[in-house]
């Protein structure tokens, strides 16, 4: 099937339950449009539907309003960082949102410190940028298996 294009930031999406019928939904949270575009290209093989946010604060609003199956977030962003964002997702009163897998990425040279902050916040996986397509797909396949067909 053709990948579903992401909705432009600020547009009104059609709401559908995460993990229900249709493509799995991924929220991409990164202040770099080019990184968000690259991630979509890498993940096209899974036919995800993409939601995007340019900041952690915007990502929280989107995640609270829209059901998602996976969150990919950068660590370094203006305002709230990716670890604090992940911590707020984990603390959500919405039980489905609080359990959504979170993959945090960073280009920070202090990988051990950033990874520790992410793990303390409850991330599901961590990857250092630049990330290859194969590496990203392996991580995504590990934390978000393909949905099983109904029996």
Regions found by a protein language model. Give the residues of each.
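Charged docking surfaces used in two-component/phosphorelay signaling
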Residues: 37-45
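The C-terminal output helix
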Residues: 141-151
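Alpha4 helix (beta4-alpha4-beta5 surface) of REC/receiver domains from two-component response regulators
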Residues: 84, 109-127, 138
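Receiver (REC) domain active-site loop signature in two-component systems and cognate sites
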Residues: 77
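Active-site beta3 strand of CheY-like receiver
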Residues: 66-72
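Hydrophobic/aromatic residues positioned on beta-strands within the core alpha/beta folds
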Residues: 105-106
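C-terminal output helix
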Residues: 131-140
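Helix N-cap/capping motif at the beta->alpha junctions
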Residues: 52-61, 82-84
């Amino acid at each position: 099937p053709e990948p579903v294009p992401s909705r432009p930031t600020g547009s009104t999406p059609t709401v559908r339950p995460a993990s229900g019928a249709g493509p799995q939904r991924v929220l991409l949270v990164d202040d770099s449009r080019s990184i968000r575009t690259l991630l979509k290209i890498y993940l096209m093989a899974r036919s995800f539907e993409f939601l995007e946010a340019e900041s952690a604060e915007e990502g929280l609003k989107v995640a609270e309003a829209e059901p998602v199956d996976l969150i990919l977030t950068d660590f370094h962003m203006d305002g709230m960082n990716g670890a604090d964002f992940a911590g707020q997702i984990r603390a959500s009163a919405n039980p489905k949102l609080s359990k959504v897998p979170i993959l945090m990425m960073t280009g920070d040279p202090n990988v051990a410190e950033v990874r520790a902050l992410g793990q303390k916040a409850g991330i599901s996986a961590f990857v250092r940028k630049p990330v290859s397509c194969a590496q990203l797909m392996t991580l995504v396949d590990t934390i978000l298996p393909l949905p099983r067909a109904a029996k």
